[in-house]
Amino acid sequence: MFGDLMVFKAYDIRGIYGRELDENFAYSLGKCIGKKFENKKILVGNDVRIGSKELLPYFIVGLKEYADVFYAGTISTPLMYFGTKGKYDLGVILTASHNPPEYTGFKMCDKEAIPLSPIEEIKPIFKKYELTESIKEEAKNLNLDDLKVNIIEEYKKFFLKRCKASDKKIAVDFANGATTIAEKEILNELFDNAVFINDYPDGNFPAHQPDTLKMECLKDIIRAVKKNNCELGLIFDGDGDRLGIVDENGNVLRGDILTAIIAKEILKEKSNAKIVYDLRCSKIVPEIIEKYGGIAIKSRVGHYFIKKLMHEIDAEFAGELSNHFYFKEIGYFESPLLALNYILKAMDEENKSLSELNKEFSKYPHSGEINFRVKDQKYIMEKIKEHFKDCKLEELDGISIYCKNFWFNLRPSNTEPLLRLNLEADDEKTMKEKVEEIKNLIAKLDASL
């Protein structure tokens, strides 16, 4: 099938360049989106990936047949949201986020920076168009400078005014991704005492995959923090919408712990604020929110669902286990820079190191996300429900089961035959025992199929 329709996901379009996403797909996609947004203003940017840069001119040529196109250059996803909001009818960035270098893709948002769901809004209108020699020639000769708009200066101006300069010694791993452009300049001005690594753009990602969650991708930042005696380290993913943090000892802080730290600081400013957290997060998150006068709202996993919910309920902040942090202040989208600003504020106001804050908020042992490759997701989830029938059940996203001294969420992957488990308990022993129990149960059920 042309342009395998499996590339259309809930949150984006993503696939391997040259195999699942090629120039013909990019041109056809551009033309379909252009028709949908005929005579509208569309902002387009790209990350540093080789596939993104190769597909860009074909995508723009398709768009230009129907819509007015403006090119922002090589930018991060938060910068695309920032540039689109209130100024353009649609924003599109060619990116595959934290995936390996052979991938590319497309993320889209409307004029309020709310994500479009490709599987719901683009896949139904997608069709193949012929990539003629004249179209190829037009793409080859496309002068991007003729379409160029500068959205970086306004972005830099906003964050340099909003974020407090710090004398803390930090290390930053840019992972050779999109944040090596604007975000690097901002951090360079905010910190006099910063160590930058992997800080030049390279779509081959020579240092490591640009993923803030995989331990093998965090070795460089951990090493840099220890070697340079830094007070904290941060790492961006490939398109700059995730922020990973390590403390002065090189220990990684989970996304839900960071969510709790940031939420506490926000609630010092706005005590009755609504704060959203994804259902995988530790129960320390709602406990902290409620302790400091906030309203804790649980959400499905994923930026598409979280941003829509934030808009609907007018939430001040949202955080995910996956290191996405969203702020009403800038339009309900991700901002690693604002997240960092609040983390530094917590360290200053509490007069604590990051390791001390991590210890304070890491009250409950958490398994982290564990993946299981299974033959039948639905069958296994039903059997797990039966096994824990005496516990409280929620089905907001997969199944969440709440028992006396532990709870867990088991949900299917949208894109792979996987089940994802997150489990938390009141003590380490129970956590390990229950993870093992569920692992064995899933293995037994899968073997029976």
Swiss-Prot record:
Reaction it catalyzes: alpha-D-mannose 1-phosphate = D-mannose 6-phosphate
Family annotation (InterPro entries): A-D-PHexomutase_a/b/a-I, A-D-PHexomutase_a/b/a-I/II/III, A-D-PHexomutase_a/b/a-II, A-D-PHexomutase_a/b/a-III, A-D-PHexomutase_C, A-D-PHexomutase_C_sf, A-D-PHexomutase_CS, Alpha-D-phosphohexomutase_SF
GO MF terms, alphabetically ordered: magnesium ion binding; phosphomannomutase activity
Co-factor requirement: Mg(2+)
Keyword ATP-binding in annotation: no
Note describing how the cofactor binds: Binds 1 Mg(2+) ion per subunit.
Family assignment from sequence similarity: Belongs to the phosphohexose mutase family.
Name assigned to this protein: Phosphomannomutase
Species of the source: Methanocaldococcus jannaschii (strain ATCC 43067 / DSM 2661 / JAL-1 / JCM 10045 / NBRC 100440) (Methanococcus jannaschii)
Upper lineage: Archaea, Methanobacteriati, Methanobacteriota, Methanomada group, Methanococci
